[in-house]
Curated annotation (Swiss-Prot):
It comes from Xanthomonas euvesicatoria pv. vesicatoria (strain 85-10) (Xanthomonas campestris pv. vesicatoria). Catalyzes the ATP-dependent conversion of 7-carboxy-7-deazaguanine (CDG) to 7-cyano-7-deazaguanine (preQ(0)). This is 7-cyano-7-deazaguanine synthase. InterPro entries: QueC, Rossmann-like_a/b/a_fold. It catalyses: 7-carboxy-7-deazaguanine + NH4(+) + ATP = 7-cyano-7-deazaguanine + ADP + phosphate + H2O + H(+). Binds 1 zinc ion per subunit. Belongs to the QueC family. The gene is queC. Pathway: Purine metabolism; 7-cyano-7-deazaguanine biosynthesis. PANTHER family: 7-CYANO-7-DEAZAGUANINE SYNTHASE (PTHR42914:SF1). Zn(2+) binds at C186, C196, C199, C202. Its cofactor is Zn(2+).
Length: 224
């Protein structure tokens, strides 16, 4: 069976991506990164999703981006309730580049020629590393920078959610049997994975379920 490394954050998008990769016949190797994120309960969610969706292996890699800083997700900076103009403070510098690089390294080790990630350019928060140009550029890099690429084995970077709305992602997940109740999206999620209901990630997630006409399985803290 062909193999793929899938980036798994523990959120709804990456859970849907695993299901889509499996539907395409890939044996999935899921990679999560403990990068110093304050909402560490997403890693607990990643473990739940990996187990529920039957991945071949789930690896958690430690890369502490707090030493670099520059993001409300790693630093002692308030997470805003809603997105504004420009690149938001929840952007983690070079995060997707770093994570895809780790996925690329593992792919070479396990003999996978395909990488999957859940970046989205429709209902997203304005992150530069979620754009189609970034995904295309990383695929070029992957084929230039690896033994497999130099030997003529084409490496592919898939972003199957890139042009889907959050509602579309919900519908695809439901079609494929994804249990979104296992996932955590909130930037302020507590230790039990309960969502704040106010941050940009919560807003986008809630709108996705509402627009799709699907009951929202998110576990919320008491909303004020």
């Amino acid at each position: 069976m062909k193999k793929a490394v899938v980036l798994l954050s523990g959120g709804m998008d990456s859970a849907a991506v695993i299901a889509l990769a499996q539907e395409q016949g890939f044996a999935v190797y899921a990679l999560s990164v403990r990068y110093g994120q304050r909402h560490t309960s997403e890693l607990d969610a990643a473990a739940r999703v990996a187990a529920a969706q039957g991945v071949v292996a789930h690896k958690v890699v430690d890369v502490d981006l707090r030493s670099i800083g520059g993001s409300a997700l790693t630093d002692d900076i308030d997470v805003p309730d809603a997105g504004g103009d420009g690149i938001p403070v929840t952007y983690v510098p070079a995060r997707n580049t770093i994570m895809l690089s780790l996925a690329l390294g593992w792919a070479e080790v396990v003999g996978a020629n395909d990488l999957f990630c859940g970046v989205n350019a429709v209902d997203y928060s304005g992150y530069p590393d979620c754009r189609p140009e970034f995904v295309r550029a990383f695929e070029v890099l992957a084929n230039l920078a690896t033994k497999a690429g130099v030997e003529g084995v084409g490496l592919r970077v898939h972003a199957p959610l890139q042009f889907l709305s959050k509602a579309d992602i919900v519908r695809e997940g439901v079609r494929l049997g994804v249990d979104f109740g296992l996932t955590v999206s909130c930037y302020r999620a507590d230790a039990d994975g309960r969502a704040c209901g106010h941050c940009d990630a919560c807003r986008l997630r809630a709108a996705g379920f509402s627009d799709a006409g699907v009951p929202d399985p998110t576990h919320y803290a008491i909303l004020s």
